[in-house]
Regions:
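Extreme N-terminal leader/targeting segments of oxidoreductases
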Residues: 2-63, 81-86, 207-227
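Beta1-alpha1 glycine-rich phosphate/pyrophosphate-binding loop at the start
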Residues: 15-19, 24, 29, 33-34, ...
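C-terminal, flexible cofactor-proximal segment of oxidoreductases
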Residues: 16-19, 23-39, 43, 249, ...
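Rossmann-like dinucleotide-binding core of oxidoreductases
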Residues: 55-60, 64-65, 70, 75, ...
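Core beta-strand elements of the Rossmann-like FAD/NAD(P) dinucleotide-binding domain
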Residues: 61, 184-195, 236, 389-398
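Short beta-strand to alpha-helix junction loop
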Residues: 125-143, 313-321, 349-361
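Feature captures the FAD/FMN-dependent oxidoreductase FAD-binding
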Residues: 130-203
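C-terminal catalytic lobe of FAD-dependent flavoproteins
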Residues: 325-327, 331-384, 388-410, 490-541
Length: 541
């Protein structure tokens, strides 16, 4: 049996009305409430999920969400909240949801942003921990998916390979491969959709970044990358060296050092590290007389404004902020500790991301002698450990290569428009989410100087607004279109290694709005939330 919503036939594109949607028979309780009834405002036929069809027939959905991580689940929740009349499918390349928070399983994994701004705006963070561990975040994401009945919309082991736009049909034809099938000869799955929302993250899930170290094959111990932490790795009473000084390294060090015989964090150069309270000081006082949701909103906006103040201070008075941060570290470690060598970076604050440590756990590990920081360059690996250019030898049983990520733009999807390949590096970014001259496609990309989710949440709501306008006016496409010539500026004002290594795969950034990527949440909140009906330089058809 097919469950079909009917629309004005004059507005329907020329497609098969028989559409395969899933691979198991539909039950009555499989059909969500919002599929009941007849609509006439949208130019698409929408067929319910979970309906078996012949293999050669293609399925059609209104919105195809790529990725079931933090951004993908949050975006789908916003679709359910704001556009319940739209059909959608979530394609996830991995076997489970959660994205980063399921993939990374190294000891002590936690957020490097406060959870009041990292959580969804529509789902208050009620845990007392301002910096949460990975398992708690994963539980939060999956709880949101349960609350909004998303799980039956998710297809796991489905990787998007390419997407072809047809200006005749005003639809995307998306090619998907599956990694859970027995046959290597199975043809790719074809899905057609009205709009693509890419929430696939910004890095390569399959492989982290590891520099080429001389002699690494000579090392007789274990070498691990945090992105693929061995489940059975035993480090108790072992000598461990952690290479790196970013968020992953400063998370690993205090946790692992509780059990290791010795632990050295080996860094080429220092990073700014900031102590933050594990529990927000306003939580208990406000919680005595305000509802939890009100407390959440208050602390969330307090955190937003504080983040922006610190970032703006780093741009306007970098020396003053630098001095403040370094003095705070001296207070933690004492004036006898060599802060100049190990905790004084050679760049200004927020040229790279600040690393937050809750309740001084990193500094406590150093004070208590459980961990040591060595600032030096690697000459080569040898059978016993690492030889440094200073001549020092670091013997180790385990070396953790916490050297960063490999960026991957848009999930490596090959886009084409009317059979012409799209080079995304030649396209300009529109409002931090769409690309010039590419119709009906948006990317969910967060901030580098603030919590990631603040921007992805705004993006999802803005896309819902676009789709509502299209439905209301009978449009079938929306395309960012550059009206006047403009200059080009770097897309990310950020000197992190993983960003610099990926400059050649990034799209362009204009020197004027709405083509200039914004790094200020309050400004985006006004432009995308409060003024969401003002769609300058968008072409609707």
């Amino acid at each position: 049996m097919y469950h079909v919503r009917t629309f004005n036939k004059e507005l329907q594109p020329s497609i098969n009305s028989s559409l395969r949607l899933t691979q198991r028979p539909a039950a009555e309780n499989d059909i969500p409430d919002y599929l009941n009834g007849t609509y006439t405002s949208r130019p698409l036929i929408t067929v319910a999920r979970e309906i078996p069809m012949k293999k050669e027939e293609n399925e059609l959905v209104d919105v195809l969400i790529v990725g079931a991580g933090l951004a993908g689940i949050g975006s789908a929740c916003q679709l359910r909240r704001r556009s319940p009349e739209l059909s959608f499918t979530i394609l996830e390349a991995r076997a489970v949801s959660g994205g980063t928070w399921d993939l990374f399983r190294y000891p002590g994994i936690r957020s490097d942003s406060d959870m009041y701004t990292y959580s969804y705006g529509f789902k208050p963070w009620v845990n007392k921990s301002a910096i949460a561990d990975g398992g708690t975040i994963l539980e939060y994401i999956r709880e949101a998916a349960d609350e909004y009945d998303l799980n039956r919309h998710i297809r796991y082991n489905h990787k998007v390979v390419s997407a072809q736009w047809s200006s005749t049909d005003n639809l995307w034809t998306v090619t998907v491969t599956r990694s859970d099938t027995q046959s290597d000869n199975e043809e790719p799955l074809i899905i057609r959709c009205r709009f693509i929302l890419s929430c696939s993250g910004y890095y390569d899930y399959d492989q982290g970044y590891t520099p080429e170290f001389a002699g690494i094959d000579d090392f007789q111990g274990e070498i691990v990358h945090p992105q693929h932490w061995p489940e059975q790795l035993h480090y108790k009473n072992k000598r461990v060296v952690v290479i790196g000084s970013g968020a992953t390294a400063v998370t690993l060090v205090p946790t692992m050092s509780e059990d290791t015989a010795s632990l050295v964090m080996l860094q080429r150069s220092p990073t700014y590290i900031v102590n933050v309270p594990g529990e927000d000081p306003w939580l208990k006082p406000l919680g005595k007389f305000l509802p939890a949701s009100w407390v959440f909103r208050f602390i969330r906006w307090k955190k937003v404004l504080l983040q922006q103040y610190i970032y703006r201070l780093s741009r306007k008075k970098p020396k003053a902020l630098r001095r403040f941060l370094i003095n705070k570290i001296r207070e933690e470690l004492g004036h006898d500790y060599d802060v100049d060598t190990h905790f004084t970076p050679n760049y200004n604050p927020w040229d790279q991301r600040l690393c937050a440590v809750p309740d001084s756990d990193m500094f406590a590990a150093i004070r208590e002698g459980r961990a040591e920081v060595v600032t030096d360059h690697i000459d080569s690996f040898n059978s016993k450990g690492i030889a440094l250019k200073s001549g020092k030898q670091l013997d180790a049983d385990i070396v953790v290569v916490a050297t960063g990520l490999k960026l991957k733009f848009g999930g490596d999807i090959a886009y084409s428009i009317d059979d012409k390949e799209v080079d995304v590096t030649e396209r300009f970014v529109y409002r931090g989410m769409m690309l010039s001259d590419i119709p009906n496609m948006a990317m969910s990309v967060g901030y580098t100087n603030s919590s990631w989710t603040l921007k992805t949440d705004l993006t999802a709501k803005y896309v819902c607004g676009l789709l509502k306008r299209m439905n209301r006016n009978g449009y079938t496409s929306v395309t960012p279109t550059i009206i006047d010539k403009m200059g080009e500026v770097p897309l990310l004002d950020f000197d992190a290694g993983y960003v610099l290594r990926a400059q050649d795969i990034m799209p362009k950034n204009g020197d004027r709005e709405p083509w200039k990527n914004n790094d200020k949440y309050t400004k985006d909140f006004v432009n995308l939330e409060l003024k969401r009906n003002k769609h300058s330089e968008l072409t609707f058809r």
